[in-house]
Structure formats: C-alpha cells, structure tokens
C-alpha cells in the first residue's frame, strides 16, 4: 500500500513539474529579446532615412498600433472596446520605439489569455450541446470586420456560443449527425489551438514590424528568418514542381538543369544557370 502511495505521489509530482515547466516555457517564449529591440530600432531608422515616403515613427506610432490590433483580432471576437481604449492610452505614454514594442507584446499576451478562454468556453459548450440548442432563429454577422467591438465578457461569450451553434447547424444541414458535427468542430478548434501554440516571440515581432512597414506602403514588408526560410522552401518546391533542378553554393540558388519534357523545358522561359 505504501509503495502504491509513493508511486502515485511521485507521478503527481512529475505531472506538477511538467505543468510548471510548460507554463514557464509558454511565458518565456513570448518575451522580447535584446536582438529584437536592436533590430526594430535599425528598421525604424532605415525606413525614416531611406524610404521614398518620409514618415517619422513618432507621427505614425498610433496608426501602427491600431493596425497591429486589427491584424491580431480582425473579426473582433477577442478584445472588448474598453480594452482597446486602455491599450491606446498605454501606447501614448511614450514615443520611444522600445515602448511601442513592449506594448505590442503585452497586448499579445492578453490576446493569448483571451484566445485560450474562448477555446475552453467553446469546448465546454460543445461537450454539453443538445439538439434543443440548435433550435434558434437569429441573424449572425459572420464578417465582423466592420462591426463595433463588444462591451463585456458576457457579450463575447454569447458571440462565441452563437458562432459554434451556427457551425453546428451548417454541418447538420450537410447530413452530419449532432455527434459527427460536434466531433468535427472539436477537431477543428483543437487544430487551431495547436497551430496557435506554435507561435513565439518571432511571430509577435513579425506582426508588429509588418504593421509598421505597411504604413509606408503595400510593397514594404519585413521578412523574419522563419518567413524567409518558408519562402525559400516554397520557391524551391515550385521550381522543382515544374521540372527545374536546383543547386546552391550556400549564397545563391541556381538552376542546374531542366528535366526533359517537363513544363519548364517546354515553355522555354527558364534556362540552366538562370538565377532563381
């Protein structure tokens, strides 16, 4: 008996340690790095000095923050109207570039908390939903990009619930049983959560800096190392998919040969050793 108690206690200890480490890791991965502070200042300096459109950070910082918030929560299902007022108030406290980045990260952490709250609320509702819940006749605005933000948490929860009910009804109309519909939506929100949990400091930085750069024009953008790698991979796959074999010298990628009869050879637009 004592051995079983010890084993159970040890397993609970390990589980608690995993939870503590998981929470610490989740918090740590959303911290700003020194390199990001330096990089942002370099980007701002470069934009102010070299861009054809002359704009100073101090003049556009409120616009940058507004765009950042729109990109985080475009459908207005996360933040309340009063929360945006609070965010804007904090942002206006300083014109320092570092302060703007700090506020962006604090806002994202709040976003993450509310995102998890929404996930848990919708999951609990899905586990308890019955057919009677679907017997409703309401007009639901799916695209809320031009709607006003809600004023309270109860209003948000009502919206979260109505969005799930709408999805359930749509699936039921496609001849899915209630159980099948529930399982499909749970799988979808689980996948969304898994994808969301892969975000880190680099992603938050990317959203903020691109909110900044896009103020200078639609063709001004920042590509993080992660996005650059994804772009290179997609470009490589695209070229290989049309029958072009690539080689790299570590700095440049070039076309070494074309597969006979492949789309690239047939069009005649690409030649070996052409820069990719």
Feature-to-residue mapping (PLM):
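Flexible, low-complexity junctional segments that flank or bridge functional domains
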Residues: 21-276
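Bacterial N-terminal signal peptides that target proteins for export
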Residues: 1-7
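Generic signature of intrinsically disordered, low-complexity, basic-rich segments
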Residues: 3, 18-20
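Bacterial N-terminal signal peptides
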Residues: 9-18
């Amino acid at each position: 008996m004592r051995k079983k108690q010890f084993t159970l206690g040890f397993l609970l200890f390990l589980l608690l340690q995993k939870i503590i480490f998981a929470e610490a890791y989740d918090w740590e991965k959303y911290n700003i790095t020194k390199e990001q502070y330096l990089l942002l200042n370099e980007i701002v300096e470069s934009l102010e000095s070299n861009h054809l459109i002359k704009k100073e950070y101090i003049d556009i910082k409120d616009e940058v923050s507004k765009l950042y918030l729109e990109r985080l929560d475009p459908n207005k299902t996360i933040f309340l109207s009063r929360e945006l007022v609070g965010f804007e108030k904090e942002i206006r406290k300083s014109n320092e570039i570092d302060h703007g980045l700090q506020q962006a990260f604090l806002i994202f952490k709040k976003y993450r908390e509310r995102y998890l709250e929404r996930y848990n609320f919708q999951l609990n509702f899905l586990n308890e939903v019955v057919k009677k819940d679907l017997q409703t006749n309401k007009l639901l605005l799916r695209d809320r990009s031009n709607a006003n933000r809600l004023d309270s948490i109860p209003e948000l929860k009502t919206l979260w619930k109505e969005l799930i009910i709408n999805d359930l009804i749509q699936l039921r109309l496609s001849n899915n049983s209630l159980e099948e519909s529930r399982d499909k939506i749970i799988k979808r929100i689980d996948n969304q959560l898994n994808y969301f949990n892969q975000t880190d400091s680099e992603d938050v930085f990317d959203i903020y800096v691109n909110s900044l750069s896009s103020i200078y024009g639609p063709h001004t953008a920042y590509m993080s190392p992660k996005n650059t790698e994804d772009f290179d991979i997609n470009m490589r796959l695209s070229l290989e998919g049309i029958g072009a074999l690539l080689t790299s010298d570590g700095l440049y990628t070039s076309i070494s040969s074309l597969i006979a009869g492949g789309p690239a050879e047939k069009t005649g637009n690409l030649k070996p050793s052409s820069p990719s």
